[in-house]
UniProtKB/Swiss-Prot annotation:
Subunit text: Homodimer.
Name of this chain's protein: 3-hydroxyanthranilate 3,4-dioxygenase
Disulfide bonds listed in the record: none
Superkingdom assignment: Bacteria
Length: 174
């Protein structure tokens, strides 16, 4: 028997996991314990953080539309992902996926992180653009590792206040 099973109908898999591809879960990993983190992420989903991935990330917008806010050279840029689009994001490009459409689905493929290689999560000031907070983590599980980091940032006025201009980051997207 093959470790990851035999081929399966991916559209049917998405339909069967649709209840996990919307808030509050929003994503589902296709295979466990592989060399790749293969995830389907659904909408609606709005994020206020920017991910600093040490490796490339592959996006394939299967259903609906989404976009990525990118933080490049001190300013925010936008990359649209229309249904059917694929995109390869280079390593260390800060990005914040935005999935405003209910029922949307995006295949995201990332490399597993070797020991000692960390991911960064950053929040920027809406008023002046300076970095408000950065946290690094040895990412083992997207589902288990990220919520405590995000909750700590959202719960702390100290972490959310911009040291440069004093503006308060609004916290969690609504």
């Amino acid at each position: 028997m093959l470790k990851y099973g035999t081929p399966f109908n991916f559209s049917r898999w998405i339909d069967e996991h649709a209840h996990l591809l919307k808030p509050p879960v929003g994503n589902q990993q296709v295979w466990q314990d592989s060399d790749f983190i293969v995830t389907v992420v659904g909408g609606p989903n709005h994020r206020t953080d920017y991910h600093d991935d040490p490796f490339e990330e592959f996006f394939y917008q299967l259903r609906g539309n989404a976009y990525l806010h990118l933080w490049i050279d001190g300013k925010r840029e936008r990359v649209d992902l229309k249904e059917g689009d694929m995109f390869l994001l280079p390593p260390h490009v800060r990005h914040s996926p935005q999935r405003p459409e209910a029922g949307s689905a995006c295949l995201v493929i990332e490399r597993q992180r070797p020991a000692g290689v960390v991911d960064g999560f950053e929040w920027y000031c809406d008023a002046c653009g300076h970095l408000v907070h950065r946290v690094e983590v040895q990412l083992k599980s997207i589902v288990d590792d990220l919520p405590p980091l995000f909750d700590a940032f959202y719960a702390s006025d100290t972490l959310r206040r911009c040291a440069h201009c004093g503006h308060m980051h609004p916290g969690k997207a609504t």
